[in-house]
Amino acid sequence: MSYPSLFAPLDLGFTTLKNRVLMGSMHTGLEEYPDGAERLAAFYAERARHGVALIVSGGIAPDLTGVGMEGGAMLNDASQIPHHRTITEAVHQEGGKIALQILHTGRYSYQPHLVAPSALQAPINRFVPHELSHEEILQLIDNFARCAQLAREAGYDGVEVMGSEGYLINEFLTLRTNQRSDQWGGDYRNRMRFAVEVVRAVRERVGNDFIIIYRLSMLDLVEDGGTFAETVELAQAIEAAGATIINTGIGWHEARIPTIATPVPRGAFSWVTRKLKGHVSLPLVTTNRINDPQVADDILSRGDADMVSMARPFLADAELLSKAQSGRADEINTCIGCNQACLDQIFVGKVTSCLVNPRACHETKMPILPAVQKKNLAVVGAGPAGLAFAINAAARGHQVTLFDAHSEIGGQFNIAKQIPGKEEFYETLRYYRRMIEVTGVTLKLNHTVTADQLQAFDETILASGIVPRTPPIDGIDHPKVLSYLDVLRDKAPVGNKVAIIGCGGIGFDTAMYLSQPGESTSQNIAGFCNEWGIDSSLQQAGGLSPQGMQIPRSPRQIVMLQRKASKPGQGLGKTTGWIHRTTLLSRGVKMIPGVSYQKIDDDGLHVVINGETQVLAVDNVVICAGQEPNRALAQPLIDSGKTVHLIGGCDVAMELDARRAIAQGTRLALEI
């Protein structure tokens, strides 16, 4: 069998899991929607149908103080059971199991009635928590147990008690957030009392034939965080209190070390889980950046853990496990760890989806149905939008011919994949290459198509992308001026002193590329831990190395410039932008806003900064100043009476946006 460790059953005593895969908890935003139960039922059922052994729901609060935001989802009353039963019945009909995550967000709750062990404000929240009294703590423990009881009545197979990531239970555990002097604070035995009593109360309420997962923070990655000795002590106490499984938690939300984004190596933290092996007899789950069945199987086969948690990979591909088990791993749409359509959406109050799979969490809104009228369609441009349209339209029965002027598919993805930390884009291109074969798309590369050649098609989809915008600066045609395509696509030589005009996504990518000192650590776990100051020995509190970050300096002197007076990189993703800024600043890259450009000549780039004229004596000026749509074919086709659709950068080119491009291409393909 392929991946024998991954597909081995796991005996929990009172029940058996059919494989070693936990679909980790993700808040989708549907938990608060009026029709959320039906949409979540479809979302989870599709994953259960394709083999997930145990699904964990998005976080549900046990009471009003624990919600993530005002109006957040709770399970604290029997009247809410029918809503949840819709979900559990759908999962069970597909042969899966599902656990409800009980999440009290503590001082991370973004509403004015938040509570915590101590009245200490989180650095990522404007609200200050109320310090819980002894009586309130006892009531909270009962609220957790009540929530678990209601979950059982609603048909859930278990619960996950969320004890990591800096949420309430985690806040009781560390001196960073617990400054109490009563029985709930002080020494570690007191600080862990709340976590243990919650698990004990839940077990007493639900009986012995019900799964209790405890999500244990094994690596806090914050100052004054927990130690490994404390982790062992807590794990043993949690086992004694009645837990069934221990899941790994990595990093608090306020930590300034990346834990799930693309620059994090695959399986980067399974070594943390392995250190707990032998200290408890419960099955251990490891997590974070496990996006590939081979990586998962390797982790299990070498004994790092008993199960793997994969969350975002099931946004990217609901069929991940069934494809792996049936020998079709090359058809898996791999999670690239970008966060652009999942976490970044949740943090602005939108529904989760996935950059590489826009149907995720929208299954009921985007059904895949056979085409009513099969058409002969031309797609011009094999970038993200064109690829997404082509394979989805062909899967519905349309005859699709995909043209591209270049020698390989991918468009801007071929730029992105070269950026250190974005190597996962190779997987996306592998997926599209394979699906072109599977769906029967006719691919014509090295083919600059004309309007006349498109006359025979029923409709044309223009996904012809963008052309870089050339800003009106005197001397813009000077030999030292390069576009980002010259650098990233054509590999033009670049000197040691560089000015980058533009601080959007492309500007940051170009800076990451030009400032990279040697091999990227996104493929090297030890190197990654060293660069970001993670103590691999786990001897230091919080898992932080005494030496701190060791990000090496750039081999080039680079300055990034933008006209806007706002913070450079302000438009980058909420959950990943800080990683790029931190990395570049640590490498010595300068970022200057509010710049006026005067001219470019042999002396360099002439600018005005804070009212002062300066000459930046650089070897090269790299232009990353936006894009214009490439619509050359649109008007001739329209003039000839043909139906034309514009998608991707060809439609809107303000910023290169793969999330929008793939979603637009997919939606059109499902409608045409």
From Swiss-Prot:
Pathway this chain belongs to: Lipid metabolism; fatty acid beta-oxidation
Residues reported in the UniProt entry to bind NADP(+): 340, 563-564, 654-656
InterPro entries recorded: Aldolase_TIM (IPR013785), FAD/NAD-bd_sf (IPR036188), FAD/NAD-binding_dom (IPR023753), NADH:flavin_oxidoreductase (IPR051793), OxRdtase_FMN_N (IPR001155)
Site residues (Important for catalytic activity, assists active site Tyr in protonation of C4), renumbered to this chain: 253
Positions with a binding annotation for FAD: 340, 385, 404, 412, 422, 449, 649, 656-658
Entry annotation: catalytic residues: 167
Keywords carried by this UniProt record: 4Fe-4S, FAD, Flavoprotein, FMN, Iron, Iron-sulfur, Metal-binding, NADP, Oxidoreductase
Activity modulation comment: Is non-competitively inhibited by NADH.
Molecular-function GO terms, alphabetical: 2,4-dienoyl-CoA reductase (NADPH) activity; 4 iron, 4 sulfur cluster binding; FAD binding; FMN binding; metal ion binding
Enzyme superclass (EC): oxidoreductase
Co-factor(s): FMN; FAD; [4Fe-4S] cluster
Catalyzed chemical reaction(s): a 4,5-saturated-(2E)-enoyl-CoA + NADP(+) = a (2E,4E)-dienoyl-CoA + NADPH + H(+); a (2E,4Z)-dienoyl-CoA + NADPH + H(+) = a 4,5-saturated-(2E)-enoyl-CoA + NADP(+); (2E)-decenoyl-CoA + NADP(+) = (2E,4E)-decadienoyl-CoA + NADPH + H(+); (2E)-decenoyl-CoA + NADP(+) = (2E,4Z)-decadienoyl-CoA + NADPH + H(+)
Induction behaviour: Induced when cells are grown on oleate as sole carbon source. Repressed by glucose.
Role this protein plays: Functions as an auxiliary enzyme in the beta-oxidation of unsaturated fatty acids with double bonds at even carbon positions. Catalyzes the NADPH-dependent reduction of the C4-C5 double bond of the acyl chain of 2,4-dienoyl-CoA to yield 2-trans-enoyl-CoA. Acts on both isomers, 2-trans,4-cis- and 2-trans,4-trans-decadienoyl-CoA, with almost equal efficiency. Is not active with NADH instead of NADPH. Does not show cis->trans isomerase activity.
Subunit (UniProt): Monomer.
Other information: The overall reaction mechanism can be divided into three stages: initially, reduction of FAD by NADPH, then electron transfer from FAD to FMN via the 4Fe-4S cluster, and finally reduction of substrate.
Domain notes: Is composed of three domains: an N-terminal TIM barrel (residues 1-368) which binds FMN, the 4Fe-4S cluster, and the substrate; a flavodoxin-like fold (residues 369-467 and 626-671) which binds FAD; and an NADP(H)-binding domain (residues 468-625).
Protein name according to UniProt: 2,4-dienoyl-CoA reductase [(2E)-enoyl-CoA-producing]
Organism the protein comes from: Escherichia coli (strain K12)
Gene designation: fadH
